């Protein structure tokens, strides 16, 4: 009996791991459109958190900031410095809201996957997770970044923007065009892969061992999640700055 009990425990653990599914989705039919409800729900939760924090922090502004206002101003200063460093002193100001929105949405989304008990909410299909755990979200963010740096380049340089594709020699035209396609791909898959892998590792560890053991991994996940948000925002700002400068 003593020999059989550990074997049963191992089998149960393996069965729980096999239940960790990837790619199961819950859809809602809205008119003629099929909506990915999991991403929609968690994204709106993240947006509500950001709006709530903004309202609380700015409802009673003081000349000398204290408490939550001080924290918000520190975050905004960090985003402003990041944008200015990558885009440049003269052109950075209009892009602070865009880069800030990207950074804060990704940051809160990533942390929500580690801190929120999404999986206790039962759905007919699949399960809730961080918005950035889904490739649809990360691709959308990357495409927004692509639109932003195309707009920045065309707005600043006009049609001469397209001259970059034949610099320093027309032979590099295919490679330069391909580069514009690989930028959003690298942004989206890097963010998606890291967040998905982190959540899967934690889910497997919780299935195998007691709750206390995965805690260090969860803290590591929080750190890497913050780094991924910073990397995405930094690269987005760098691409925008590069498109306005006119060289690689």
Curated annotation (Swiss-Prot):
Keywords: ATP synthesis, CF(0), Chloroplast, Hydrogen ion transport, Ion transport, Membrane, Plastid, Thylakoid, Transmembrane, Transmembrane helix, Transport. Its main location: plastid. InterPro entries: ATP_syn_F0_a_bact/chloroplast, ATP_synth_F0_asu, ATP_synth_F0_asu_AS, F0_ATP_A_sf. It comes from the Eukaryota. GO terms for molecular function: proton-transporting ATP synthase activity, rotational mechanism. GO terms for cellular component: chloroplast thylakoid membrane; plasma membrane; proton-transporting ATP synthase complex. Coiled coil: none annotated. It is found in: Plastid, Chloroplast thylakoid membrane. It is a multi-pass membrane protein. The chain crosses the membrane at residues 37-57, 96-116, 135-155, 200-220, 221-241. Key component of the proton channel; it plays a direct role in the translocation of protons across the membrane. F-type ATPases have 2 components, CF(1) - the catalytic core - and CF(0) - the membrane proton channel. CF(1) has five subunits: alpha(3), beta(3), gamma(1), delta(1), epsilon(1). CF(0) has four main subunits: a, b, b' and c. Belongs to the ATPase A chain family. This is ATP synthase subunit a, chloroplastic. The gene is atpI.
């Amino acid at each position: 009996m003593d020999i059989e009990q550990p074997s049963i425990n191992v089998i149960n653990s393996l069965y729980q791991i096999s239940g960790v599914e990837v790619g199961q989705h819950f859809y809602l039919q809205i008119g003629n459109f099929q909506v990915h409800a999991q991403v929609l729900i968690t994204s709106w939760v993240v947006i509500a958190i950001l709006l709530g924090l903004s309202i609380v922090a700015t409802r009673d502004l003081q000349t000398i900031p204290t408490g939550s206002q001080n924290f918000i101003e520190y975050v905004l200063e960090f985003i402003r410095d990041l944008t200015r460093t990558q885009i440049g002193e003269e052109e950075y100001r209009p892009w602070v809201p865009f880069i800030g929105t990207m950074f804060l949405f990704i940051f809160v989304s990533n942390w929500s996957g580690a801190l929120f008990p999404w999986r206790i909410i039962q759905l007919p299909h699949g399960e809730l997770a961080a918005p950035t755990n889904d490739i649809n979200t990360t691709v959308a963010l990357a495409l927004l970044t692509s639109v932003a740096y195309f707009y920045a380049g065309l707005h600043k340089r006009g049609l001469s923007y397209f001259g970059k594709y034949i610099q320093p020699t027309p032979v590099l035209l295919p490679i330069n065009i391909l580069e514009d396609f690989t930028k959003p791909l690298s942004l989206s898959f890097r963010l998606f892969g890291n967040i998905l892998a982190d959540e899967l590792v934690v889910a497997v560890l919780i299935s195998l061992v007691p709750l206390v053991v995965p805690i260090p991994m969860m803290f590591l996940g929080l750190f890497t999640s913050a780094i991924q948000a910073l990397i995405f925002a930094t690269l987005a700002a760098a691409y925008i700055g590069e498109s306005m400068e006119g060289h690689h």
